[in-house]
From Swiss-Prot:
GO terms for cellular component: chromatin; HIR complex; nucleus. It is found in: Nucleus. Belongs to the HPC2 family. Component of the HIR complex. Residues 38-85, 134-301, 314-338 are annotated as: Disordered. This is Histone promoter control protein 2. The lineage of its organism: Eukaryota, Fungi, Dikarya, Ascomycota, Taphrinomycotina. Residues 193-223, 321-330 have a biased composition (Basic and acidic residues). The gene is hpc2. It comes from the Eukaryota. It comes from Schizosaccharomyces pombe (strain 972 / ATCC 24843). Keywords: Chromatin regulator, Nucleus, Phosphoprotein, Transcription, Transcription regulation. Component of the HIR complex, which functions as a histone chaperone that cooperates with cia1/asf1 to promote replication-independent chromatin assembly. The modification Phosphoserine is found at residue 175. Transmembrane segments: none annotated. Residues 152-165 have a biased composition (Low complexity).
Length: 338
């Protein structure tokens, strides 16, 4: 019996009938007996049958190959090479869904227009940047978290209490995978509430500080007005207060001055020498009957009822003279003073 399997190859099988009318023949087994299992493997690759049938046949063939290899002493099993998947390494750049803007940024020009060679990317001048056109579909939108809407918090204390309560409830109700998201949303709500509270508190001291500044300015103005209205003391009075005459040390102890009768300024001119005679320290003897108005701070007076009176003056001392009195006359003779 001969069968034609196309023009390329002819397979010949000899099957004895032995006087039988109905004979059942397994063509695959007969081919395996003559050509071996390799012929059947090639036929399976070209076969378009179901995957279930192919898996069942492959297991049967593997068992036959192991049996034939053990009988012949040679192993014909070969390991299949793993195919390389190019889809993992490359992608379709024309696909608008893929956002590949970062790749274009890396391909920026490495030189300027002044005769340099550009390795890759567009030609760009110094200081300029590459403008990449992005499709509208690839724009990323920020997702608004529902935590701010579900947990409004006007005050800080209320937010902390609600956050603790919700966190305790989430441990019992939610699963372990959803707990981190829950805690993050609570923390964000607490942070937003703290920021709002700080802004409100910052507004109050500003208003208070402005009012305080106004009050201080008004007080300063009032003090300036009052100080300008008070009359200043004359310099003459200050100098009179500052001037103090020092009394030199003497051998005799000081005696408190006796009460003397007041005399008119005319008596002073009769018994006092001109100012030129009193510049140097000197002692002058006066009669007991004469009396002078002497300042207690400028001189020390030693008086006795029956003896003469000695007056000790310092170098810069001056006798008190009435301001309304006229200057002493220079024509007074010195012989009048003993």
């Amino acid at each position: 019996m001969s069968l034609l399997s196309g023009d390329q190859r002819i397979i010949c099988l000899e099957i004895p009938l032995q006087g039988k009318e109905n004979v059942h023949i397994n063509f695959a087994k007969e081919v395996e007996k003559l050509y071996g299992p390799s012929v059947q493997e090639n036929s399976k690759k070209n076969d378009l049958s179901d995957s279930a049938d192919s898996e069942g046949e492959s297991t049967h063939v593997d068992e036959q190959q192991a049996a034939n290899g053990a009988a012949d002493g040679t192993q014909t099993i070969k390991k299949k090479k793993r195919k390389r998947r190019y889809a993992d390494e490359y992608y379709d750049r024309t696909d608008p869904f893929i956002d590949d803007a970062e790749l274009y940024i890396e391909e920026k020009a490495a030189a300027t227009k002044d005769g340099f060679f550009v390795f890759s990317g567009p030609l760009v001048a110094e200081g300029d940047t590459v403008k990449i056109e992005r499709s509208k579909k690839t724009k990323k939108k920020k997702k608004t978290s529902l935590s701010n809407a579900t947990h409004p918090a006007p005050a800080v204390s209320a937010v902390v209490a609600s956050a603790d309560a919700s966190f305790d409830d989430s441990r019992d109700i939610e699963s372990e995978d959803e707990q981190p998201l829950r805690t993050l949303s609570i923390e964000m709500a607490a942070k937003n509430a703290l920021k709002e509270a700080k802004r409100e508190n910052a507004k109050v001291p500003k208003d208070v500080s402005k009012k305080e500044a106004k009050t201080t300015k008004s007080k300063e103005k009032a003090t300036k007005k009052t100080s300008s209205s008070v009359p200043k003391q004359s310099t003459g009075e200050n100098t009179k207060k500052a001037v103090k005459l020092e009394t030199p040390l003497t051998s005799t102890p000081p005696i408190p001055p006796l009460s003397e009768p007041k005399h008119s300024p005319a008596t002073v001119n009769e018994h006092i020498s001109p100012p030129s005679a009193l510049t140097n320290p000197s002692t002058e003897e006066l009669k007991p009957s004469t009396s002078l108005p002497i300042d207690q701070g400028n001189a020390s007076v030693v008086s006795k009822p029956t003896q003469q009176v000695s007056i000790v003056l310092s170098q810069n001392a001056s006798l008190p003279v009435d301001e309304h009195q006229a200057e002493p006359e220079k024509s007074i003779p010195t012989s009048s003073i003993p």
